[in-house]
Swiss-Prot record:
It comes from Phalaenopsis aphrodite subsp. formosana. It is an enzyme of class 2 (transferase). In plastids the minimal PEP RNA polymerase catalytic core is composed of four subunits: alpha, beta, beta', and beta''. When a (nuclear-encoded) sigma factor is associated with the core the holoenzyme is formed, which can initiate transcription. Its EC number is 2.7.7.6. Binds 1 Zn(2+) ion per subunit. GO terms for biological process: DNA-templated transcription. Disulfide bonds: none annotated. Belongs to the RNA polymerase beta' chain family. RpoC2 subfamily. GO terms for cellular component: chloroplast; DNA-directed RNA polymerase complex; mitochondrion. InterPro entries: DNA-dir_RpoC2_beta_pp, RNA_pol_beta''_euk, RNA_pol_Rpb1_3_sf, RNA_pol_Rpb1_4, RNA_pol_Rpb1_5, Rpb1_funnel_sf. This is DNA-directed RNA polymerase subunit beta''. The lineage of its organism: Eukaryota, Viridiplantae, Streptophyta, Embryophyta, Tracheophyta. It catalyses: RNA(n) + a ribonucleoside 5'-triphosphate = RNA(n+1) + diphosphate. HAMAP family: RNApol_bact_RpoC2 (MF_01324).
């Protein structure tokens, strides 16, 4: 008794909470010290103790135990405020959609997590023995996430697709949910229940398949005699923890030496002591035996398996290690699927944690330990590289808050902070994110409107002539409000253009263009509201040609129309001068003509491959809706491969004499489309067949123009009714009809089977229609074929160059299909559709080794010589450095202005003006500003800015009168001077009346100067050439300007007369985009709605409302500049990386994919080339036979290791520890099959037969002839159906097929596995039934000795291969001959 008491006094009492991990450690230590029997006795006592205590405690849960956290209300308010600001920023266009989504997730997730962290301290302070508090960390019947949903907030939920729903559930289950929150909650809960059911069944089925593959793997021998092993080293990126887990329980494959001292011998099992010795001495690499290296075919030896997972000794003979391995991998999946159910679909992701201030006070920290930076959302912060403390000083107390390494401090030193304010952000652990996937986020148009963007866009490299654009830098994309007219019943019967309207001339027939019977009074009476004020001057409509509209209207960028197709150009080395001719007779003949549209940006800068002009050919114009088809056209299988038609886009060719025309085709499949309101009562059924002139809608007299098949599709707010014309064919089951959406069949094709079939004369489009699941028929639709002439002889554009200089600047013609392949095009209110546009593309030879970006300046020049007015386009190649330097020039009595600036001035509206300019070819000159003879010019102003440069003579009465005479449709007001500006986005043409706006500007001061010989300063950007203006010539600018010079986007400088006081006003340019909430004036009010400046009055602006979208580089824009979009159309596609949740519900399918050997990763494009390079190098080093052998061995070994690592990655992300040897047994079975190839026909195996790898190697050694086979990866299902036991296969899947095949082949089942013995009722060969199999005969012993001799031979071979390569060839032959003679002696 005394001895017992003495022992008890020496015992240590541990007062700690014990969890599952601690229980595992305790059990393993008990087994090590006391053995299995005594340990089971102790565990029974622990179980009985727990049962008694739980019964005595009898914890129950009542509704009063659910105590809500008091800080929840203001935490939710804080998160709502941040979400509101985020929504505002997104609405203003400051934050794009992906950024908004990520920040919203972070805000609510951080709030929810902080509430969860506050939960336990709150319970400990108020009610430590609360049942909810006790259950929350028990791990048996509840977890923190469940209790958090009960008393905290449910937070963010996942939708059925697994995506996060943006609207969080702010209530908890104790408070009760609102209707909206309940519906969102049902999404997640349903997803949780379904996931649990599906994933549990998936995990169970996975376990069954795994056990099926390896049920016959037993430990049958002590040692298989292998000399192979795999190397384990911490240098291969393996952490020390994983290194230790990999080594413990294994057996060494080779001796381990440190210098001359051996610290580990071959075939010794590795314990924790030996691992510590390896780490201390840094012994690496360490070669260990694994199931991969075992020489057995259908079993495994004791030493290759290692220690038993239950107790510390080597595994016993007769252990069913295969079943243990299958269950070890499948069981964690079965258990962990319940995690989804526990959280009920609540979104759980990893974001940065926040540190909050414990009380009000002033924060202080050492500024020398932090460095200024920005958060990932762009907010200023301080980064700390070491752990340190920040101090918060309040009146009575000081708080020290620990800030971990690499955290971001979000407040400044000495700043006053409030209690629970976020002061720091701890970086999220990157190790939690194992899987990243690229996700596409589509942005859809919220309203109907016209697209504009504020930067250069370029085509994607894959589709250079499509409507998909990429933006090179962050910019805004605008949707200007307004849509196209769908009904022409209320439109006036002639084309009356209002200010800045874009009217489609093709929507009216020529006879409706004008009506001479209408008087001005009738027009004014009809359209009084359109012009706003009654006192506005009525326009003169008496001349009919003023009303005739342009032939086409599609304006893409700021452009100026030239309605003449005849262009001649003289070409110089770095410059074009293209004279433009205007045919006045055409205007008098009242014929609307189609012409070339010149397209030059506002700043006049063109880059390489810019489009400078385009021409809409009327041949490619359609009046009906339809579908375009081009690219690689799908043709039915009855056509040979050579008949595939590929649209190759435009051919690049130099502008020499090009006589050959290359013709490409594209196809247009016409169809009739009606867009009807969503509530329209339609009178035809879906998939019905109607005739011509059938009434479609009950209350509207809409009739079909063609007969055919009707397809009705319901959109968001409308019905889309399509009518397909064509023939309908019903086919039997014999004919195979492709299930694709449609197939084009070329002419000259007929069916080979049917005798009476005729060959096709034209292209047809075959479409499969399936009205019900069982029935289908085929619709054969007519196709309109268009041919694109891809070459135009550009030599006709230029005259012969006498100097024969090198052609640097070049023009080429590109045919541009305006609609993407397979796109459904719908015409609106009888408008015509332009399918192909011919574009004139400017290009030049880029200088090599030049970091300077080359640009081209394009400008319009107007020259009058001897009363002859000529217009030119001047295109000049200029090298411009990336950063401009500013210089000022002071010259007495003159102001310098560059030739380029002058060209840009006159580019504004050259065809409207009748001004005279004489340009003299001098490199540098002055701009004289003498008074006119009648001294009417009162002030002169020069402005220069990034986007505009204007010269304005104010109050020049002669100019005003002349303009009034020339254009009676332009009313001029005489306040202080007109600003008749052509809107940058809307361009005028001569055939319609001039699109002018009336921008009246008031000046605070007017400068009356008698002498103009004063100094002017001009901000100039070199290098440019200067032009000289004669002092006596008349200076004219169609865009007289005011002194409005400053805005919030561009900084423009104004250089006034030196006597005047310099004041700055905001510049308001027409077409300028303004974001909401921006101050336009210093003391004015904010802009209440985003939009584009439409009209500028004296005291007001008219803004066309627009919606801005922020677009980041790499985002894809769908559609052309200026294209009209409808509500719900796809505008932008963002591509961003999203961290996949590490939940096992996402991991299990990945494990299954790996084990079933399905492709999960994208394959490298140059994989084949790399493999060929590897083969060539290894053959060169080792010779042909050894190169192939070692290459094949390495491939199999590496693929096995890779598969094990991928599966471990999934399980480790969940904190599940599975020993590698279990995975290795499974992977060994997946990779142990080879496919007999047809290269060498052997008598033993059939070509295409699956055999074991070791069996194939042994058969090759025994037979005189070689067997050709290919290593192959078989999934676990296929491996289960390719075993040596047909009883096992038949009991798994495809029973009848397997048994019939086995009977035909006469297979014999040797009943070596567990399953076949269970099926037949025999004793299974494991455990006590194992000894029945093991009784060695003499013959068996002889085989064993032979194998050992062979092993020694292989060992010598490997030494020679690695150390004495030169001796190898001679020694190998000699050794093999000796070995053969020894065998012959034994046989004889």
């Amino acid at each position: 008794m005394e001895v017992l008491m003495a022992e008890r006094t020496n015992l240590v009492f541990h007062n700690k909470v014990i969890d599952g991990t601690a229980i595992k450690r305790l059990i393993s230590r008990l087994i090590d010290h006391f053995g299995m029997a005594y340990t089971s006795h102790i565990l029974d006592q622990v179980k009985a103790l727990g049962l008694r205590r739980a019964t005595a405690t009898s914890i129950s849960l009542g509704i009063d135990d659910l105590l809500t956290i008091p800080s929840k209300r203001w935490l939710v308010q804080d998160a709502e405020q941040q979400s509101f600001l985020l929504e505002k920023n997104h609405h203003y266009g400051n934050v794009h959609v992906v950024e908004k989504l990520r920040q919203s997730i972070e805000v609510w997730y951080a709030t929810s997590e902080y509430l969860r962290q506050e939960m336990n301290p709150n319970f400990q302070m108020t009610d430590p023995s609360n049942p909810v508090h006790l259950m929350s960390f028990s791990g048996a019947r509840g977890n923190a996430s469940q209790v958090h949903q009960l008393v905290g907030m449910r937070g963010l939920m996942s939708d059925p697709q697994g995506q996060m729903i943006d609207l969080p559930i702010q209530s908890n289950l104790r408070e009760g949910l609102s209707v909206t929150e309940y519906i969102i909650s049902c999404y997640g809960a349903r997803k949780g229940v379904v996931d649990t059911a599906v994933r549990t069944s998936d995990a169970g089925y996975l376990t069954r398949r795994l056990v099926e593959v390896v049920q016959h793997i037993l430990v049958r021998r002590t040692d298989c005699g292998t000399i192979r092993g795999i190397s384990v080293s911490p240098q291969n990126g393996m952490t020390e923890k994983i290194f230790v887990q990999t080594l413990i329980g294994r057996v060494l494959a080779d001796d381990i030496y440190i210098g001359l001292r051996c610290i580990g011998t071959r075939n010794k099992d590795i314990g924790i002591g030996l691992v510590n010795r390896f780490i201390t001495f840094q012994a690496h690499p360490i070669y260990i035996r694994t199931p991969f290296t075992c020489r057995s075919t259908s079993w495994i030896c004791q030493l290759c398996y290692g220690r038993s997972p239950t107790h510390g000794d080597l595994v016993e003979l007769g252990e069913a290690v295969g079943i243990i391995a299958g269950q070890s991998i499948g069981e964690p999946g079965t258990q962990l699927t319940l995690r989804t159910f526990h959280t009920g679909g609540v979104f759980t992701g990893g974001t940065a944690e926040h540190v909050r201030a414990p009380s009000n006070g002033k924060i202080k920290f050492d500024e020398g330990l932090v460095h200024p930076t920005r958060t990932r959302h762009g907010h200023p912060a301080f980064l700390c590289f070491i752990d340190f403390y920040v101090t918060i000083e309040s009146r009575d107390i000081r708080h020290n808050v620990n800030i971990p390494t690499k955290s971001l401090i979000l407040v400044q030193n000495d700043q006053y902070v409030e209690s629970e304010q976020v002061i720091a952000e701890i970086r999220a652990e990157t190790s939690t994110f194992h899987f990243k996937e690229r996700v596409q986020k589509h942005i859809y148009s919220e309203s109907e409107g016209e697209m504009h963007w504020s930067t250069d866009g370029y085509h994607t490299p894959k589709y250079p002539y499509s409507n998909v654009h990429l933006l090179p830098k962050t910019s805004h994309l605008w949707i200007l409000a307004g849509g196209l007219c769908r009904s022409n019943s209320n439109i006036v019967s002639f084309s009356l253009h209002k200010d800045q309207d874009q009217m489609n001339a093709n929507s009216f027939s020529l006879k409706d263009l004008f009506d001479l019977s209408l008087t001005n009074d009738q027009v004014r009476h009809k359209l009084l509201d359109t012009f706003g004020k009654k006192d506005r001057e009525s326009l003169d409509y008496s001349k009919p040609y003023r009303i005739i509209s342009k032939g086409h209207w599609n304006l893409i960028e700021p452009s100026t129309y030239i309605r003449q197709e005849n262009s001649l150009a003289k070409k110089r080395r770095n410059r074009f001068v293209i004279p433009l001719q205007y045919d006045q007779e055409q205007e008098n003949k009242l014929i609307p003509c189609f012409g070339i549209s010149i397209k030059i940006p506002i700043n006049g800068i063109l880059r390489r491959n810019s489009i400078i002009a385009y021409f809409d050919d009327p041949r490619y114009r359609r009046s009906s809706s339809g579908i375009t088809k081009y690219g690689i056209v799908e043709v039915d299988s009855i056509v040979k491969k050579e008949d595939l038609i590929e649209y190759r886009g435009a051919k690049d060719f130099s502008p020499k004499y090009q006589t050959q025309m290359k013709v490409d085709q594209f196809f247009f499949i016409p169809e009739e489309i009606h867009i009807l309101p969503g509530s329209s009562p339609i009178m035809v059924r879906n998939n019905s067949i109607i005739g011509v002139d059938t009434r479609l809608v009950l209350n509207i007299n809409t009739r079909s123009r063609v007969g055919g098949l009707v397809r009705v599709e319901r959109k968001k707010k409308s019905l889309e009714l399509k009518i397909f014309s064509g023939d309908i064919h019903f086919y039997g089951e014999v004919d195979k009809i492709s299930r694709h959406s449609g197939i084009l069949i070329p002419p000259g094709i007929g069916k080979k089977d049917s005798k009476g079939s005729k060959k096709l004369k034209n292209w047809i489009y075959v479409q499969r229609i399936t009205p019900t699941k069982k029935k289908y028929f085929v619709l054969v639709r007519p196709v309109v074929t268009y041919e694109i002439a891809d070459g135009i002889n550009l030599a006709t554009l230029f005259s012969q160059d006498l100097l024969q200089e090198k052609n640097n600047v070049q023009l080429r013609i590109v045919n541009y299909i305006l609609y993407e392949n397979g796109k459904s095009i719908r015409g609106i209110s009888h408008t015509s559709i332009q399918l192909v546009r011919a574009c004139l593309v400017l290009t030049w030879d880029q200088e090599k080794k030049s970091s300077i970006e080359e640009k081209v300046h394009a400008s319009f020049v107007e020259i009058r010589t001897n009363d002859l007015l000529c217009y030119f386009i001047r295109i000049e190649l200029v090298k411009s450095t990336l950063s401009y330097t500013e210089k000022r020039y002071d010259t007495a009595g003159s102001g310098l202005i560059s030739n380029n600036e002058l060209d840009r001035i006159h580019r504004k509206n050259p065809f409207d003006s009748k001004a005279k300019i004489q340009i003299f070819p001098q490199h540098q000159g002055t701009l004289g500003t003498l008074l006119n003879r009648n001294k009417e010019c009162q002030s002169f102003l020069i402005l220069s800015s990034s986007n505009c440069s204007r010269i304005g003579p104010f109050n020049t009465s002669r100019y005003n009168n002349a303009t009034k005479e020339l254009d009676p449709m332009t009313p001029i007001r005489y306040l202080l001077g007109p600003l008749g500006t052509i809107v940058p986005r809307i361009v005028n043409s001569r055939s319609s009346y001039y699109l002018r706006t009336y921008n009246q500007v008031f000046l605070k001061k007017s400068f009356l100067l008698e002498n103009f010989q004063q100094t002017f300063q001009v901000l100039q950007v070199p290098p440019f050439q200067y032009c000289f203006l004669d002092e006596n010539s008349r200076i004219y600018n169609p865009d007289p300007c005011s002194n409005i010079i400053w805005n919030s986007f561009h900084l423009n400088w104004c250089f006034l007369h030196h006597d005047s006081c310099e004041e700055a006003w905001p510049i308001i340019s027409l077409g300028q985009f303004l974001c909401e909430n921006v101050y336009l004036l210093k003391y004015g009010s904010r802009i209440k709605k985003s939009g584009q400046i439409f009209i500028v009055h004296v005291d007001s602006l008219v803004i066309r409302s627009a919606k801005p979208y922020l677009v980041t580089p790499g985002a894809t824009v769908h559609g052309h500049y200026g294209e009209t979009f409808y509500e719900g159309d796809t505008l932008i596609t963002f591509i961003y990386e999203k961290s996949r949740s590490g939940d096992i519900t996402q991991g299990l399918p990945k494990v299954e994919q790996i084990l079933e050997v399905r492709s999960i990763d994208s394959i490298s494009m140059n994989l084949e080339r790399r493999v060929e390079g590897w083969d060539e190098r290894i053959r060169r080093i080792l010779g042909i036979p050894w190169g192939f052998l070692i290459g094949a061995e390495l491939t199999i070994a590496q693929s096995r290791i890779s598969l094990v690592n991928k599966i471990q990655k999934v399980y480790r992300s969940q904190g599940v520890q599975i020993h590698n040897r279990h995975l290795e047994i499974i992977v060994r079975q997946v990779t142990s099959r080879v496919l007999v190839s047809e290269d060498g026909m052997s008598n033993v195996f059939l070509p295409g037969e699956f055999i074991g790898l070791l069996r194939a190697e042994r058969a090759g050694r025994v037979l005189a002839e070689s067997i050709c086979y290919r290593a192959i990866l078989l999934g676990i299902t296929k491996s289960s159906l390719n075993t040596q036991s047909f009883i096992s296969e038949a009991s798994f899947q495809e029973t009848a097929r397997v048994l019939a095949k086995a009977a035909l082949r006469g297979r014999i089942d040797w009943l070596k596995g567990l399953k076949e013995n269970v099926v037949l009722g025999g004793i299974i060969p494991v455990g006590t039934g194992f000894n029945k199999l093991v009784h060695r005969s003499k013959q068996d012993k002889n085989i064993h000795l032979k194998i050992k001799r062979k092993n020694l031979f292989e060992l010598e071979m490997s030494d020679i291969l690695l150390h004495h390569r030169e001796l190898f060839c001679s020694c190998a032959q000699e050794l093999s001959m000796r070995h053969q003679t020894n065998l012959l002696r034994n046989v004889s």
